[in-house]
Amino acid sequence: MTETEVIDKYICQHIEPEGDYLYRLYRATNIHTIHGRMASGHIQGRLLKMLVEMIRPNNILEVGTFSGYSAICLAEGLKEGGKLYTFEINDEMEDFTRPWIEGSSVADKIDFRIGDANIEAPKLGITFDMAFVDGDKRTYLETYEMVLGLLNPGGYILADNTLWDGHVTDSCYDHDHQTQGIRKFNDFIAKDPRVEVVILPLRDGLTPVSYTHLTLPT
C-alpha cells in the first residue's frame, strides 16, 4: 500500500462507517463503469453528508450524478422535507444509476433527471441553498454562473475535482481541455468578489464556495 492508501485506510477506520449500501454501490461502480474512481467514496461521502447537516439546506442542486453515490450521501444529510435535484448529462448511466438511487433509503429525497443541468436546472423554477458541482470540467465556469444565478444569498457551492490530479499546475496539460476548464474556473472564482473560496486537497480537490454578495460591482 502507498502512504496515501495507508492514511486513507486509517481515516476510514476513524470516521462514520460508509454503510453496506454505499459500499456495495462503490464496488459496483468500479466493476461496471469505466471511470469508477469518479465516485466520491467513503471519506468525501461522509464529508458531504456532514456539510449538508451543518448548512441545513431546503434544496440542493447536484450537477453530475454519475453512479449516484454522492447524491445518496447528500440526501442522507437533508432535513425532513429537504430535496436534492440531481442531473446527469450522460444518458447511458441511467440504467445503472436509477435503480441504485431508487433502492436507497433516501430515494424520496432525490429527484434524479437525465439532461444538461446548465439548460434544465433553471427550468425547475426553484432556488437552492447548496449545490454540488461535479459535471463537465470543460464548462465548469459556465456551470458556476448558472448555479450562482439559482443560489440563495448565503448559500454554498461545493466544486469537485478542482486540482484535477495535479494537472492544474503541470504545463504538460496546457492543451488539455478539461484542465483548461478547471484552471479557468479556479482563476475566476479566486477573484470573484461575490464569493469566498477555499480549496481543500481532499482526493482530487474540493472547493467550498460561500455566496456572500448578490451582484458583481459595476
Residue ranges and their predicted role:
Residues 1-18:
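N-terminal auxiliary segments of SAM/dcSAM-dependent transferases
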Residues 212-218:
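Conserved small/polar residues in nucleotide/adenosyl-binding loops
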Residues 42-103, 108-118:
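SAM cofactor-binding core of SAM-dependent methyltransferases
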Residues 32-40:
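Class I SAM-dependent methyltransferase Rossmann-like catalytic core
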Residues 123-130:
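A short acidic, Gly/Pro-enriched loop at the edge of an enzyme's catalytic core
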Residues 141-211:
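C-terminal substrate-binding/active-site "lid" region of AdoMet-derived donor-dependent transferases
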Residues 89, 136-137, 160-163:
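Short strand-turn motif at the edge of the Rossmann-like AdoMet-binding core
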Residues 60, 131-134:
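Receiver (REC) domain switch-region micro-motif
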